[in-house]
């Protein structure tokens, strides 16, 4: 054991923590953080200060990463203009000098946006499960449907309500917390969805066939499978007639097709066909097909579609590729040759073109994206430069970009209007079919305020029989969707193990206190708890800084200014306190106990008595500004100007420095508001001379207040009966200020226009957008390109530029404690009693989403399992991982690698295995799932008798066919580039027969994690595994 960890929390330990904290306390000199890179020219390590880091976190971003809109004009060989169009052009950064700078956009994380396994709720959580459906009319006499279920969130023992509201404008999905003591009514659910007025109260629908109709409504969100055009263009070809007339492709083009997927024979093809003829070869003999993260993709390849020498325009080829939303154009020739332009293609339907060039000399691909102007922004943004030397990485990036692009196109006005008309027609038709039956059967109508999870007490047996029939029909529908290939099971066939940027690192295990707030101090963390303010670092014993007589509710450590600012809340005696960090450090040397409230009398800012909130400007390049809210009064405080020695920021020439910095602060002005603010944020003006703004939220509105004049302007009015303000976050797009306003389930981005001649301009901007969270958050963190919403039991991650969902992680008892730089949070973990530190990860493995619980496990255990204890760990998400400022992320996560869970209803503990990509296996996998599930539904389970002998024989035949198709048995599973499926042979292997190499992979991960925190119990455990959960991976067909 490290000698520093022995004994009590004495002076030796305090000096150990302070040595880490005071690395920046030599009178405010900020240490530099070194981040390694792979670039040989940058091998000398890039230095980034915390202040630069803060600027990146708080939202200094640019949409230019996603291209700029240009007017593109195409002309023929004679120079005559043919067509013109406005497209957003993405070609990576064009700044040649940016490659050597540390803050450049070198690479991006590749994520599917709005993935179906997170968005198709009805298929995933409702279909085939007991749930309730309601029908009603809103105040405008438009019909709506409501579906409600009570479910366990990803088998994490977190029960919650899920609700879907179906309207002609689209669907709205929310999660509501479950409380065994608090009942929930349909009225309260609709009120949470901001639907409070009705023409008639909703009535429950008991027909089990309603599940089929609601599944059709959900499928209007878009197909889970995709068809993309692939057009081959020779060097110098400038018209679509020339490109479509290429009878055969080049060797490089064939290599590109092999990278995209498998060449399949269309005749007799039973998978997703993408509109191609699979019976009579009228659309060609072969095509290219792949499966990516559960999405089936068919490519309409121009050289594989029928060619006609008599038809110069190649109408048959244009009929397919011209009707694809997304088209890949593979262009041969040097970079200097005439480039492709979208206006060369005559199509009113194609909105996105991906221009691919192959450099044979350097064996790399270059990518350029053209998007029609009306298509919303979508990621991932192209790296700089947009050149891919790793072909597999290029394939993943291209497929994700194309899938996200097609989804974004469906949000354009043209497609959105069509979808709205279709939804309106379907909902009205369904309403007219159901209402006569509902009027006849009034006895089954439940009260508008009935508790949802309870069934009627009368006719119990009849109700149970109805629910059984309801579930049976729903599971049959789910089976049909799977066999048809329309199941949104994206994570059921994940790709290679991938480390996500939001993966947490365990900062402190078994944290025994309730954390209130915190802020980093050097490498340590200053945490306000129920036991006082503690200095925490890893698993070393905590050092007390302030005792419990000073209940701190807000805290800011300003290392560059040698300041500690905190708000101690004790009723009317609440105040702001300011300390010198150097003085706090000096006082801790040799001290066994923290300072009491009486020891801090000299550090009070007296005029802040009774304050309930304060905010500081997060950019410290200018003077420090603090705005304190005392009921409905705002008090602006700044630090007095004083001379500084050159090169040493934050150090006064006053000699000697007083221990308390109270005298250095001055009160500038008071501003009166009409109510007490619940949320407050400071917005920097565009220049030093311009006015700064204060954003405040109270009543039903967000206002901005001019710091100089106190004049208030309405920014946004909230149309809701009840408002829960969450946050106002200042973000800066290309230097221009904007605000993310968060309340209830909503998040709105508003551009803050600068002052003009003393008056504030408020006008709608094309860059404004709005989206809804799935669960009501209590805190929001902006770390471009991500927005992280923290709820009581989950973390929802979206993109700043468009609000699209990229991931939802289940984190029981999640509590955010710090987010000004790195993100720190506490979360509950369950471990076995008596388990050693080295085995804590394995001991808690049964609570991981990777391992589905046994069938006899109760859905919502009221208490912990036998031999289990619950503790809280303190976790850290490094900011530099999120903002993506380095080519390789420098910090090593203790999380184990992502494991692929088989998409079957039987939860097998499969170890980490390589994924094979074989076309025949993917189809066979679906057939085996379907046949196995069909036997279950028909009651033909393999329980003894002659049935038990058939399964092994079929299984052995399957394995034999697979070995023959692959040229004999293989000792290892090899990954190819065409599909992300798991072979059925592996899926049916029990956990004890899993790939031994996969088992070793787990072991090596644990050993690596143990290197960083030797002897720390459970240091590698995580509150949530950032891979597919069992509920996401496993399509439950029981």
From Swiss-Prot:
Q: Where is the composition biased (Polar residues)?
A: 1019-1028
**CNH domain: which residues?**
512-824
Which residues does the record list as Phosphoserine (modified residue)? Answer: 68, 449, 455
Which InterPro entries does the record associate with it?
CNH_dom (IPR001180), Rap/Ran-GAP_sf (IPR035974), Rap/Ran_GAP_dom (IPR000331), Rap1_Ran_GAP (IPR050989)
Which Gene3D superfamilies does this chain map to?
Answer: Rap/Ran-GAP
GO MF annotation terms? GTPase activator activity
Region (Disordered) residue ranges read 833-863, 937-1038
Pfam (any one): CNH
| Gene Ontology biological process terms from the UniProt entry | regulation of small GTPase mediated signal transduction
Keyword NADP assigned to the entry: answer is no
Domain named Rap-GAP is located at 214-430
Annotated positions of the Phosphothreonine modification: 851
The reply to whether Methyltransferase figures as a keyword in the UniProt entry is no
Which of UniProt's keywords are assigned here?
A: GTPase activation, Phosphoprotein
* PANTHER family (UniProt xref): GTPASE-ACTIVATING RAP_RAN-GAP DOMAIN-LIKE PROTEIN 3, RAP GTPASE-ACTIVATING PROTEIN
Which family is this protein grouped under?
A: Belongs to the GARNL3 family.
Q: What is this protein called?
A: GTPase-activating Rap/Ran-GAP domain-like protein 3
The protein's gene is named Garnl3
